[in-house]
Structure formats: C-alpha cells, structure tokens
Amino acid sequence: MINKQLLKKRFNNHAKTYDAYADVQKSMAHQLINQLSTNFFNQEIAILEIGCGTGYLTQLLCKKFPKAAITAVDLSSGMIELAKKKVTEDRVSLICGDIEELSIERQYDLIISNATFQWFNSLHTTIKKLYKQLKPAGSLLFSTFGNGTFQELHSCYSHAKQKLGLFSNSSPGQSFFSLEELSQICEQALVPLREHPFKLSKMEKLEVQYFPTVQAFFTSIKKIGASNSNEESYCQRPSFFRQLINLYENNHRDENGVKVTYHCLMFNITKTNQ
C-alpha cells in the first residue's frame, strides 16, 4: 500500500527540485503528447489531467489544445503552487486533491496522466471511475512505470541480501506491473461496462539514464520526491548499503557512468461509439 500522507509530504518537500531531476518523466510527457489525435487540436474540448506536478505536461497541453478547458489535479499542494506560476491561463483550473478520493462531476474528451498511476492504491477501481467520465469517443491516455524499472537496483538489492544472509521480503521500493499485467487490470475493470465498449492500445519502452555515482542516482530519486512511500519495511543497515553500492558499481557501471533503467508503459483507452 502507498502511504498517501507520506507521499504528499515528500512531493511537497521536493517540489522545487522536481523539474531539475525529472528528465525521464519529461520524456514520457512528450511521448504522451505525440500519441494524441489531431482531431481535437482546435476544438473547445474538456481535458482532465491527473498528477500534473509542476505543470510540465499542462503547459504542453495548453500549446497543443489552444481552445481546451483544462482541469489539472495533483496530490501535492507544493506542486500545485509551482504549477500556478507556470500556467496562468484562465481556461486552466488547478486543483489540489487525490483523484482516488475526488468526486468527478463532469465528462471529458480527454483524461491524461503522466507517471502517476503507480501511486494509486485502487488501480482497478480508479480506471473504471475515470473511464465512466469519458465522453463518447473520448480517451484515457496514461503513462506509468513497469516492472523493469530500476532493474539494476533490484538485482543488487537481492544479491546484497543473499551475501549478508538476510532473508526478509523487503525491497528497495514499490513493485510495478508488467505491460500485460496492467493490460489485464484495465480489461478486468472495463469489460463489465458493456454499455460503454472500449478500444485499448499499449506500448512499452526502456529509457536508460547514467549517473556519475550510485549516490547521485539515489539523490535524483529523493529530489523528485519519489523515494519509497510503501508501508512495507526495507533494510537500512549501513553494512547492507555499502554492499549494495559496491555491487551496483561493480556490475552496472560502464564508460558512460552508473546505469539506471526505466521501464515506461503507455496506455490509450478509447470509448468507442459502437
């Protein structure tokens, strides 16, 4: 389970450093924009953005849809305050809240979310809730992280536990779904809604970053507020982390630096007119 209060606190604390370290998230935002249909670009459509953060994707949406009314939601008040400084158009409403708890009153032509669905505790329920708020021919478009994310870290964490004889079920962070697992969750959520047929498309991509040191990688995670917000425990022994860092440096460093893999998933669910 994600501890939402802890998550909110971390995003609030690191809102001001988020943009400087969120390179992969920015890349994913552009990939989302590139997936959008050109049909709506000059129309007065309604858009709901979930997890707007500091407003990076919100700005891209404003440029792509000059006539759209945009509602952007984020859990963190610190993120919302920064987004308000970037996005000042009257047609954009910025709201602080948890989309899993908020009541959605209106319907939207587009519901879009970048690198946020991994923070949901009730993914099945939330996908169904959002899909119901789509207008006919509307789309739910989202990106999130897959189970190949931080594969180097997870491998070294497991090996470090073995070397030190630790047999706990702890992990260095939350677990992510594979493309197929998340696809099944979407279908299980939506198939019962027979009165609202859907079309689902999906894709995955690996993004690789390099850091000068393992510590620099850990710092980048902290600076975007995305350090472990699970309620599960993880090993914090100094001897364990020395072992972990040594394994990472020895096994995942090349001429470019320390390698970090992000597994990016993208889903587009369209409410068909059938």
Swiss-Prot record:
Keywords for the protein's UniProt record, in alphabetical order: Biotin biosynthesis, Methyltransferase, S-adenosyl-L-methionine, Transferase
E.C. number: 2.1.1.197
GO biological process terms, semicolon-separated: biotin biosynthetic process; methylation
InterPro entries: BioC, Methyltransf_25, SAM-dependent_MTases_sf
Pfam families, A to Z: Methyltransf_25 (PF13649)
Chemical reaction(s) catalysed: malonyl-[ACP] + S-adenosyl-L-methionine = malonyl-[ACP] methyl ester + S-adenosyl-L-homocysteine
Keyword S-adenosyl-L-methionine: yes
Gene Ontology molecular function, alphabetical: carboxyl-O-methyltransferase activity; malonyl-CoA methyltransferase activity
Main enzyme class: transferase
Pathway: Cofactor biosynthesis; biotin biosynthesis
Biological function: Converts the free carboxyl group of a malonyl-thioester to its methyl ester by transfer of a methyl group from S-adenosyl-L-methionine (SAM). It allows to synthesize pimeloyl-ACP via the fatty acid synthetic pathway.
Family: Belongs to the methyltransferase superfamily.
Name assigned to this protein: Malonyl-[acyl-carrier protein] O-methyltransferase
Organism: Priestia megaterium (strain DSM 319 / IMG 1521) (Bacillus megaterium)
Gene from which the chain derives: bioC
